[in-house]
Amino acid sequence: MIRHTINLKERSYPICIATDFQELGKTVLSFRQGNKALLITDENVDNYYSDECMKVLQVSGIEVNKHVLKPGESNKTLEAVYGIYNKMVECKLDRSSIVLALGGGVVGDIAGFAAATYMRGINFVQIPTTLLAQADSSVGGKTGVDFNGHKNIVGAFYQPKAVFINVNTIKTLPKREISAGLAEVIKHGLIMDEEYCDYINYNADKIFKFDENVLQYLAKKNCSIKGYVVEQDEKEDDLRAILNFGHTIGHAIETVENFRLLHGECVSIGIVGVYKIAQYMEVLSEQLVNQVKEILLKLGLPVSLPGLDVERVYNQIFYDKKVKDNKLKFVLPRRIGEVFQCTIKDNELIKKVLLDLSN
């Protein structure tokens, strides 16, 4: 098992990267205070991994119950959190108990928010089963739900006690889900590490063939890059905003399309959008934009959305959490592996780019 530590002083925690769940019980025992745990998962993941995880935990002497959510972003609501609260009370969870989030980013966000707010915070563990969650959402302590049509507008920063990644869980994902996860993977290379981009591009076939060595390297590298950023800026005051690369446009598309597209697909289109903004600002060349588009296409990701409602997406962008005084702040590329933050005052430029993405 590979271990990587996120160093946040008293909130530091390990990321454990394995090829099965055998060490999960040992990982939980390393910090547990009480004997009760609640495993939160969704209907899809429940069919594959819940029984195995619960058995490992029970053998370790942990009294574990289960709560199953409906899958998908459309169910990432306060109502889902209320359901978890009811189960927590029913199971008599207290401040020494543990919440385990077994699933993708939606499960992690909901379960983490419930853990952050129940009894003013109880321990929780992320057990991400999708490539997207393993690469991004399980690390860093962001939790929350959507509200009134706005993505992640209700939430909290709340760090897990541990992240346990079994890289082989992605074998049960549809190819489309794997590609969506690769949007967050390639994002890390685009913002900080050109060599990592080259590695992903070169090993794309091995990723889709579930090469364990490649998958473990991806998990370790993703956690290393994201972990470094989170360690420098836990609450997204400055540097951490670079992790939102492609997300300003991506989140707006995701919301306007009513979550018809996967998160990673929207991020991919958003990445092309920020490269186009940088191109029009003469920061980089059209050739580089096309190079990035070729990589995304190789990973099975969209680079445009024909028929995109430009006006609605443009208006939705202003709900982004980086907006200050009604001014749009973007994370833009300078080259592959380097980005910078920039306030865009030319709203027509944004509309021009959105129009490009709609063709």
UniProtKB/Swiss-Prot annotation:
InterPro entries: Dehydroquinate_synthase, DHQ_synth_AroB, DHQ_synth_fam, DHQS/DOIS_N, DHQS_C. It catalyses: 7-phospho-2-dehydro-3-deoxy-D-arabino-heptonate = 3-dehydroquinate + phosphate. Keywords: Amino-acid biosynthesis, Aromatic amino acid biosynthesis, Cobalt, Cytoplasm, Lyase, Metal-binding, NAD, Nucleotide-binding, Zinc. Its main location: cytoplasm. It comes from the Bacteria. Zn(2+) binds at E184, H247, H263. Catalyzes the conversion of 3-deoxy-D-arabino-heptulosonate 7-phosphate (DAHP) to dehydroquinate (DHQ). NCBIfam families: aroB. Belongs to the sugar phosphate cyclases superfamily. Dehydroquinate synthase family. This is 3-dehydroquinate synthase. The lineage of its organism: Bacteria, Bacillati, Bacillota, Clostridia, Eubacteriales.
